[in-house]
Amino acid sequence: MFTLTKDILIKEVEIYTLKIPLNKPIKMAGIVVDSAENLFVKIISQNDTYGWGEASSAPTMTGEFSHGMFSAALFLKNFLINKNLTSLNDLDILKKSPLYENKGTKSAFEIALLDLIAKENNIPLFQLFASQSKRHSIPIIKMVAGKTISEELDDFKKALDEGFTKFKIKVGSNDAKTDLNRCASISKIGHDKCFFSADANEGFSHEDAAEFAKNAKDVGISFFEQPIKASEKNKITEITAFSSVPTCSDEGVHSINDVIEIGDKSITSGLSLKTIKLGGAYEAY
């Protein structure tokens, strides 16, 4: 773990919210998202160095809305003013605060603190966790969702022209047969560098999820994310056992204990680790 070269005194905390319209709405099982409503936190040290943190309001992930996040941030702010940071362990101030849950808000504060610590020590942020980077870049995943198949194919072709190679096809709003046909049509016009996953966001019935899982590999899918309700762990384990591709948990991951349980019980083959649901990256580390 990185050792701070000097103590950092927090002088001020500024809080902002911003609603950002999306160019195109994203349709998932049970919800349509047409804007990003984000919380921004700016933490300023006595040296006037500052760190920025951000988190999206995500009611389906953390139960938080932007107005509630703003109020929670005002509450947390009082615990940081005049706080002296001496090590990364001082990030525990967020976990130890009286504020219950509000993990998205806490993750925005944590990123701002990490950004501030990195700047005060003149290093890139990743070096707080590791001395060397394992990779210099990662691909961006492009969503394919919520339109007619002809519109989705047009969007997919445009994304290919823009250089995207990794795609997540949103499924679960239709029956399995319809979504399998969608995936087949999209993957068929991709090239050999394309990678496709399917994400049901808990939208399938057990029967449709089973049918999709059995045939996913044949339509070009590499892994299948959150096929049914996360609470139906035994049924998800059954789907994982006979799925033609690896399965992935997402809505079922809200804590490190969830991560451990999913692995120990082989509920799914892997998981989507969103730090917003854990209260920040340090907890995941």
Q: Where are the model-predicted features located?
A:
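N-terminal capping/lid subdomain adjacent to the active-site entrance of alpha/beta enzymes
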Residues: F2-F196, N201-G203, E207-A210, K214-D218
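Catalytic core of soluble alpha/beta enzymes
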Residues: I169, N174-Y285
